[in-house]
Amino acid sequence: MMFFKLIWRRFLKSYQNSRLHCFVSKILRALEFEGFIITYSQFGEDMILENYFRGRREGFYVDIGANRPIQGSNTFKLYLNGWRGINVDGNQQLINGFHKVRKRDISLCEIVSNSSEQVSFFVSEDDRVSTISKEFKEWIKDHRSYAQEVTMIPKSLTQILDQYLPLSQKIDLLTIDVEGHDYEVLISNNFDKYRPEVICIEDHTFSFNNINGNAICSFLFDRNYELQGYAYPNLFFKTKLI
């Protein structure tokens, strides 16, 4: 088992954005058995989400800060189950990878925020922690370095959905992972118009000792969502209005 895991990690690294990777992943997905489960996301978020949506086919996700199409993705496991959706990332090179291996999806190179003012997008050397948050960039500077700074004009999540969400399409899942700017992305959505069933959102500041004082929790509680789970650093919410 350990030997297989080592080979799989090397395969992920070598072919992470390829059609071959997608094909092999589908085969392995079909061969999953009890006690051996494949995860693609960074902290196993996709296993939590798959468990919630178990048996649901042809769902729809919106993935903000999508990063890579396979490795580290919260939504690739759902894609293999027949889902489709909208992927958004500020790195055009990463979005090109989505175009290659996730043909059913709509994949966009955009920055999402609650402000339309021009921002600097800091692209990390390993592509994993790119951000527009100067505070996050400063917080992680001892562990990651940034290779490029790109000037971009953000759009709100509502604008993205107005333009690209298929007509009458229900959003089953909204996942947000944008390295320190997650709250701003969240509040840029019009929840009266677009109401995801489940929300997975990253928050490095969350504490069980101060749930009601947490900005993300307070915002979603006010919009009739309930906190369903927490797996560092991600919060999982479900709407009460279904």
Outline where the language-model segments fall.
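Phosphate/nucleotide-binding beta-alpha loop and adjacent structural elements of enzyme active sites
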Residues: 2-242
